[in-house]
Amino acid sequence: MNIKIVVLVIFAILLGSALAWHGSKHHNPTKAPTEAPHRGGGGGGGHNTPAPTQPPRQNTPAPTFQALNVWFFFWLLLLARAPLTYVHITATSSEPIKLLVPLYVYPGAAWDSVANAAKTGVKIIAIINPNSGPASSGPDSSYTTYMNKLTAAGVDMVGYVHTSYGARAVGDVNADIDTYASKYPGLKGIFLDEASASASEISYYTNVYNHIKSKSGYVNSILNPGTQPDQGYLAISSNIVIFEDAGSNLKNNYASWVKCAPSASQKSGYKYKFSGIAHSTSSGSMSGIINTMVSVLAMGLVYVTDGAAGCCTYNTLTSYLSQEASAVHALN
């Protein structure tokens, strides 16, 4: 039993006994004894059945203090339990911080590295990108082999689809989603790149979101505007990448990015709605960037790489994936 409950129970018993003793000093011992009080509904008190040889008596002090003893103990016990129940709910509703890895390279050694990192216990979501989206013909034998390998290692995969900030035809976006769903078995959702942050495009992304959710097993719908979007996007995504830039910019513009962090009361609920990707970051700065992403910006999915900005940022994995996996795993 929790020590807090034990202390409160002892306190309730002692105080209740003192109250009952105090009430007994006002009780007339020469009168006929009464039956034990019965708790009544709504009043919180009790009443006694008098001895048949005596007329009914009202306002007898002793039973009042006895009833007070019972109810005092009851409410203190409830107060003792309430905070513990809250903590229990908070603990069981938490999720692990995960790595969000842009795996834009052809299956091979890099995929092996991701599988090995997952075996250490860190949770990983890998974004696969066969051809700036799905290959219309579906995965070749190498993709099939390595997708199975990642699944066996516990990695969740999502398919890359670009949206051109809402300018790409929604039918083309949904067609890519259909191709992934029909030809790339085992995926857990879609990563929507070049996503808009404007409220004017919410209808567009609602259409896409509903299409993603119609696919069996597609639990992830990740948007990548790379900045803080309109709040309406929270309802039509599982995660939103609110930072994609050089890690030094997260540090240099720390004050401006703090505004993206939810308030303390909201942080628990929004934690898994935010994601961050930092490139051009040395191994020595990696841990500090991750800690800022998680503790300040309440991000649930993170990735830091030493890949430089440009067309080929994610054509290779970060050189310190193993250390990064350990750093993220240690946060859970």
Swiss-Prot record:
Annotated stretches, region: Disordered: 26-60
Signal peptide: 1-22
TM spans (from-to): none
Top-rank taxon: Eukaryota
Keyword Ribosomal protein among record annotations: no
Pfam family for this entry, one: Spherulin4
Sorted UniProt keywords: Signal
Keyword Signal: yes
Identification of the protein by name: Spherulin-4
Organism (species): Physarum polycephalum (Slime mold)
Lineage: Eukaryota, Amoebozoa, Evosea, Eumycetozoa, Myxogastria
